[in-house]
Every structure is written in structure tokens, then in C-alpha cells.
């Protein structure tokens, strides 16, 4: 691989943690990665880890050579869906089961039923297998990629490593500028997580940006090119049909999907049905050869609150359901993309209809944004909707950064977007009762109650920022064991007071409730001794 500027990426463990591996039984050489948080109590807490070898101090990172291939990979034996239907627990399924703390048979069954997907192109051996499905932890995707205006290969590789460091489960390369093929090659060869694309973007570049010049042959060849490189899943806007385009005419924001608008322009120019729709069977055959997963695009998603849940959006969703059945008949894995901009009271309906019309294929949503009024804060407006839709059953959330609607995200924006969406995903998992979700909350809450500040930092999603905020006012090392922070100070800390009550109870052989009553009685006597006065004179 060649690049104009050699990429430089962030490496080394996350603060308070180390990289550990568990050997995978039955797959020689395979090791399942975890982020181990070392607690001051002498215990440890292992977390799901997406950062690849970049947080392993013993790993040799050579971006030009790329990451090593994973052990146990078997090529040319069909798709994960076909093998799951045949009753086989693949090496990827076994890896995922160990990673998720779930039975391997559950992984196989969910894939066989089409309710989960394992994006793992035969030609992308560098990835650590992962699963997207509502029975498992909610995943987060981070979009990166250059534009015609800005960015470089080096910057995009750095963003990929940075996003996975903070928890991105997949990456989408949405490059639309120069060197699309080369940028994607660098990302694929160095990505420990699945990589998705939108092939229509590169196809459009090949016809100099004129949608009317697109053909099925140009698109097909672009898809094959990307399959050969190792792209794991592809967004295909095959549900944008000619007859649906007029349904968007009265919308406030029309068609906001880039892929959707490209296909709508082609349909109107030729007054013919979309070549993605009419050639879908052939597309399935190509995907099946490489085990590429469909991410059926919502090209008519609402781009404003006013357009949410309208006729155009749901007409396309019904068509995506039809295409899901066709893809599965070819043994191809499928997930469904969703909105967009949706007010909170309309969010759950999207999940209900997607599951009904699309045979419970994993739902993958962009937010949704719960309001349109906060440019520069859309990582927050969308995380609100993302948490609600995750609780309702969405399997993967596509992050939104503070730069949404404003510009191309930089490194800081990528981290802010990932963290916001890890919060939303985890909140959704807690609400839907994911079996392992609350363990981390309990560990952090216990550390907080016991004033184990360093443990609180290490268990958090962003240890660096948590420590930075604490140290702005209490930077000294003894403050890391103090029983207060700068918010309440030493006398008004509710947790310190609660601990005092418990200490009182232990000292006097009482339970906490008795201790509270005894302490209140003491204060009552003290009040009487001061003449039942609410206000006492100031001490001289």
C-alpha cells in the first residue's frame, strides 16, 4: 500500500486498563480480547473490547503491512447464514459467544433465523468477529471517510483507530473525495472491526458525479471491486422505487439520503425502475460468494421531524422487507437501515413495523434525532432517540457527531460521537434487560460509594476526561482517596454522610434504619437543649 503521508495512530492501553486475551477452545491460536480494568481492591473487571492490537503494548503495529489474519478462518464454505442453517457453529460464532458471554448455540440460532448477522467478508481476515442482533449487546457504528473538500488517507486511518479505541464496533468508510479505493484499502488492512461502505458513492465518482450516467454494469463492477478488497457490509438503496419519489414532494426536507437522492435522480431521468431493484438477484449472488452482508439503505428516511413516519418512509420499508426475503433465499445476511429524524413518541413504531415487515432482521438506525433545533449538539439530540430505539430492539446505532449538518468530523468529533452513542447503546441494553449490562454500572457505583476515584475513572467510558474533570479542582494525588469532591465538599457529601450512618450502626450494633432513628433522636435532644430555636446566634 502507498499513501501520500504515512499514517500515525494512537496506541497503548486505555488508562487504568490492560489488554488481556482468553484462549478459544477448539480454534488453535485464536484469542478473544478484553479490556481488563485493574481495581484498587485487588480485583479486576473485564470489558468488551473493540480496539484491536492498538491497545496491546506487546503488539507490533505496521500500518503498511496491515494486521495479521485471524486463526480459524475458513474460506469458500458458504455464508455464515448458510452454515448456521446447516447447524454448524463456525469459528466466528464460537469467538463471538466467548466475547459476548453467550452460549454458542444461541449465536448460531439467531444467525440461522436471520435475527442477527456476522459481517465478515472472506477477504477481510484482519477482523475480530462480532455480531449484530437484538439478543446481544447493542452495537455502535462510526462513519469516517474523506470528502471532495477535505481530509486524507492518513487522517481517515487515524480516525478509524481512534473510533475503535473508544468503542466503535464497526466502521463505515463513506469517502466521496479523491483516492477512494486507496483510502478503503488502508482502512481495511488495518481495521480490527467490520468495515461497511456505500458503493454508489464510488460508482458516482466513476461517472464524474452525474447520476444520470450510472449503469448497472458500473455499479456491479464497483461492488465486486469492494468485495474483492474485503468490505464486510454494504449499504444498498434498492428500496427507492420510481413510484415512491413523488411521495417526497411535499416534505419539508425532501430526500436527505445521498444514496437515496442519487437513485431518485436516476429513476426520474430514465423514467425506469431502479437498477438496484431490478438486478437485486444478481447482487445477492455476488454478496453470497464473498459473504458480504446487506445493509438495506433507507434512502427515503426523514430528514426532519416534520417528515417522520410518512408515506414515503414506510413505503420503502415495506419494499426492504420484500428484498430481505430475496436475500435470505440466496443465503445472504441482511440488516435494515432506519431513520433519521423522529420525535420521541413516534420512535417505537419504527421498530415494530421493521420487525413485522422485515422478518426481524437486525435494525440499524442513524440516531434518530429527537429534535432539529440543536446544530453542533446533534450527538446529544440523536443519542436521546438512539437510547429509546435501542431499548425497543434496534441492534446497531450509527453515531452522529457534533459536526452533523455542519461539516466533516475531526478526531475530537469522532470520539464525542462514539462516547455519546456508547452511552445510548448501554442505556438501551440496561432498559431491555441485557444479561450483562448492569454489571459495569454496579462496579462503578460501588467504586463511587467507596470513594475509589481511580477505579471510577478506569471503569468509565472515557477515563481520560473523567480524570481531567476531577483534577481541574482537586489535582493532588491525596484527593484520589478523599471522601468528597469539589461539588459538595467534605461536609455535604451525601455518600460520606451515608457511610457515617453505616459506621454508627456498626459501632452500636444497629442496622442502618435503627441507626438513622438513633441519630435523629440525638439531633432532637440537641435541638431541645438549644431552646428549640431554629436560628442560633453566631459563635463569637
From Swiss-Prot:
Give yes or no: UniProt keyword Membrane. Answer: no
Binding of substrate occurs at 143, 172, 201, 237, 257-259, 298-301, 337, 364
**What is the protein named?**
Phosphomethylpyrimidine synthase
User: Function, please?
Assistant: Catalyzes the synthesis of the hydroxymethylpyrimidine phosphate (HMP-P) moiety of thiamine from aminoimidazole ribotide (AIR) in a radical S-adenosyl-L-methionine (SAM)-dependent reaction.
In short, the EC number is: 4.1.99.17
- Cofactor list: [4Fe-4S] cluster
Q: Per UniProt, which keywords does this protein have?
A: 4Fe-4S, Iron, Iron-sulfur, Lyase, Metal-binding, S-adenosyl-L-methionine, Thiamine biosynthesis, Zinc
Q: Name one GO cellular component term.
A: cytosol
List the gene name: thiC
Q: Which residues bind [4Fe-4S] cluster?
A: 485, 488, 493
Amino acid at each position: 500500500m502507498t499513501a501520500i503521508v504515512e499514517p500515525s495512530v494512537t496506541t497503548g492501553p486505555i488508562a487504568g486498563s490492560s489488554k488481556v486475551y482468553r484462549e478459544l477452545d477448539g480454534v488453535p491460536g485464536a484469542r478473544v480480547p478484553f479490556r481488563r480494568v485493574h481495581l484498587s481492591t485487588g480485583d479486576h473487571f473485564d470489558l468488551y473490547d473493540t480496539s484491536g492490537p492498538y491497545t496491546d503494548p506487546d503488539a507490533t503495529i505496521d500500518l503498511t503491512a496491515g494486521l495479521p489474519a485471524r486463526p480459524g478462518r475458513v474460506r469458500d464454505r458458504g455464508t455464515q447464514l448458510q452454515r448456521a442453517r446447516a447447524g454448524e457453529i463456525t469459528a466466528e460464532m464460537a469467538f463471538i459467544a466467548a466475547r459476548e458471554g453467550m452460549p454458542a448455540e444461541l449465536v448460531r440460532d439467531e444467525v440461522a433465523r436471520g435475527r442477527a448477522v456476522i459481517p465478515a467478508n472472506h477477504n477481510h481476515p484482519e477482523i475480530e468477529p462480532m455480531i449484530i442482533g437484538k439478543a446481544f449487546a447493542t452495537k455502535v457504528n462510526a462513519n469516517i471517510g474523506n470528502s471532495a473538500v477535505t481530509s486524507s488517507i492518513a487522517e481517515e486511518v487515524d480516525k478509524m483507530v481512534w473510533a475503535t479505541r473508544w468503542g466503535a464496533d464497526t466502521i463505515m468508510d463513506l469517502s466521496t473525495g479523491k483516492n477512494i479505493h486507496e483510502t478503503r484499502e488502508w482502512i481495511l488492512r488495518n481495521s480490527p472491526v467490520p468495515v461497511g461502505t456505500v458503493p454508489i458513492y464510488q460508482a458516482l465518482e466513476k461517472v464524474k458525479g452525474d447520476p444520470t450516467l450510472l449503469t448497472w454494469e458500473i455499479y456491479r463492477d464497483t461492488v465486486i471491486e469492494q468485495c474483492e478488497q474485503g468490505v464486510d457490509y454494504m449499504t444498498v438503496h434498492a428500496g427507492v422505487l420510481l413510484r415512491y419519489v413523488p411521495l417526497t414532494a411535499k416534505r419539508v426536507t425532501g430526500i436527505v439520503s445521498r444514496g437515496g437522492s442519487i437513485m431518485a435522480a436516476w429513476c426520474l431521468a430514465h423514467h425506469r425502475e431502479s437498477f438496484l431493484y431490478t438486478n437485486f438477484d444478481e447482487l445477492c449472488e455476488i454478496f453470497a460468494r464473498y459473504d458480504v452482508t446487506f445493509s438495506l439503505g433507507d434512502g427515503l428516511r426523514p430528514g426532519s421531524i416534520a417528515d417522520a413516519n410518512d408515506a414515503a418512509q414506510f413505503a420503502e420499508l415495506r419494499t426492504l422487507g420484500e428484498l430481505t426475503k430475496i436475500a435470505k433465499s440466496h443465503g445472504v445476511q441482511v440488516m435494515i437501515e432506519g431513520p433519521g429524524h423522529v420525535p420521541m413518541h413516534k420512535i417505537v413504531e419504527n421498530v415494530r413495523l421493521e420487525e413485522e415487515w422485515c422478518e426481524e432482521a437486525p435494525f440499524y438506525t442513524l440516531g434518530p434525532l429527537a429534535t432539529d433545533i440543536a446544530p453542533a449538539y446533534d450527538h446529544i439530540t440523536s443519542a436521546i432517540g438512539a437510547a429509546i430505539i435501542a431499548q425497543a430492539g434496534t441492534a446497531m446505532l450509527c453515531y452522529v457527531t457534533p459536526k452533523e449538518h455542519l461539516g466533516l468530523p475531526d478526531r475530537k468529533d469522532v470520539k464525542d460521537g462514539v462516547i455519546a452513542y456508547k452511552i445510548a447503546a448501554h442505556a438501551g441494553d440496561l432498559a431491555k434487560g441485557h444479561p450483562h449490562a448492569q454489571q459495569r454500572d454496579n462496579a462503578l457505583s460501588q467504586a463511587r460509594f467507596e470513594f475509589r476515584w481511580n477505579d471510577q475513572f478506569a471503569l468509565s467510558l472515557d477515563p481520560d476526561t473523567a480524570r481531567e474533570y476531577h483534577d481541574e479542582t482537586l489535582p493532588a494525588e491525596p484527593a484520589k482517596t478523599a471522601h468528597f469532591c469539589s461539588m459538595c465538599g467534605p461536609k455535604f457529601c451525601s455518600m460520606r454522610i451515608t457511610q457515617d450512618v453505616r459506621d454508627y450502626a456498626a459501632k452500636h450494633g444497629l442496622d442502618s434504619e435503627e441507626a438513622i432513628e438513633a441519630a435523629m433522636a440525638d439531633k432532637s435532644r440537641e435541638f431541645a437543649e438549644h431552646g428549640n430555636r431554629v436560628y442560633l446566634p453566631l459563635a463569637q
